[in-house]
Amino acid sequence: MPIATPEVYAEMLGQAKQNSYAFPAINCTSSETVNAAIKGFADAGSDGIIQFSTGGAEFGSGLGVKDMVTGAVALAEFTHVIAAKYPVNVALHTDHCPKDKLDSYVRPLLAISAQRVSKGGNPLFQSHMWDGSAVPIDENLAIAQELLKAAAAAKIILEIEIGVVGGEEDGVANEINEKLYTSPEDFEKTIEALGAGEHGKYLLAATFGNVHGVYKPGNVKLRPDILAQGQQVAAAKLGLPADAKPFDFVFHGGSGSLKSEIEEALRYGVVKMNVDTDTQYAFTRPIAGHMFTNYDGVLKVDGEVGVKKVYDPRSYLKKAEASMSQRVVQACNDLHCAGKSLTH
């Protein structure tokens, strides 16, 4: 299918929330990882989200360019072409963008999509993330208001983060402590600043103990009840029934989470879960195995010439793609979106 239109993307998220499932958002950095993600979605019979971080986008532009916008556009255009050959919907998103990179990443990408929409087309991306977790909440939400207006004009959904996700991603490290839980006051301020969709649709990455990186199951102290509290605060603020779920939540830092915690988060309105660390390992593991198994073929040892068919990058990248695709299928199963593509 062609990349999801704004209307299809909104329907994807709406169905997920209504039926208590979520979509994996797979961080990609190359054509190989994009191929792996889309194949995984298709194998699972699920729609899905592909996203590029600032570092991933820069990597995607190559060592000679090293430009985030160039890489994001190139990877997005590639995804548009490949996704059209598959029978599921794929949406494009950009991951964490801090304040110091807004002018060199999200704002230029918003401008590109706005230009496309002004000519009667669809945006290049379906959503962008503004990560204001490093600045005071009032400044975070003031910037979010400005970006939400620009995003809505370009038919794009904005993702924001309130609270801090622990661990490390793209070289940005955050401590793991009691600050990793979004407060009721911050949920209320979010509703006051951004509303409940009337100023533009947004996704909320609230923090409930999330940690980026690699952790053994059980070592991440998640409190999904924080999300339930957030929904209750928002419902009360908006005068809605107590069981209403005004927020569309995003689950960051899911590696090492227990399945029971994921299940609970889904009940409280999570519609998108970021997956990066686990798919990175799934991609790299068969490459490592290939190198160990064929070390005397991939290396020119003791004056020998090696074996071309095993140092041909295709020989191990195919294995990497297949392994990562399998991990994407697992993510779809864990989030209960498998078999639920809107195309079915």
UniProtKB/Swiss-Prot annotation:
The keyword Metal-binding applies. D-glyceraldehyde 3-phosphate binds at S53. The keyword Metal-binding applies. Zn(2+) 2 binds at D131, E161. Its cofactor is Zn(2+). It catalyses: beta-D-fructose 1,6-bisphosphate = D-glyceraldehyde 3-phosphate + dihydroxyacetone phosphate. One of its GO terms (cellular component) is extracellular region. Zn(2+) 1 binds at H96, H212, H252. Transmembrane segments: none annotated. Binds 2 Zn(2+) ions per subunit. One is catalytic and the other provides a structural contribution. The active site is at D95. Catalyzes the aldol condensation of dihydroxyacetone phosphate (DHAP or glycerone-phosphate) with glyceraldehyde 3-phosphate (G3P) to form fructose 1,6-bisphosphate (FBP) in gluconeogenesis and the reverse reaction in glycolysis. Signal peptide: none annotated. Keywords: Glycolysis, Lyase, Metal-binding, Zinc. It comes from the Bacteria. This is Fructose-bisphosphate aldolase. Belongs to the class II fructose-bisphosphate aldolase family. Dihydroxyacetone phosphate binds at G213, G253, G254, S255, N274, V275, D276, T277. Pathway: Carbohydrate degradation; glycolysis; D-glyceraldehyde 3-phosphate and glycerone phosphate from D-glucose: step 4/4. The gene is fba.
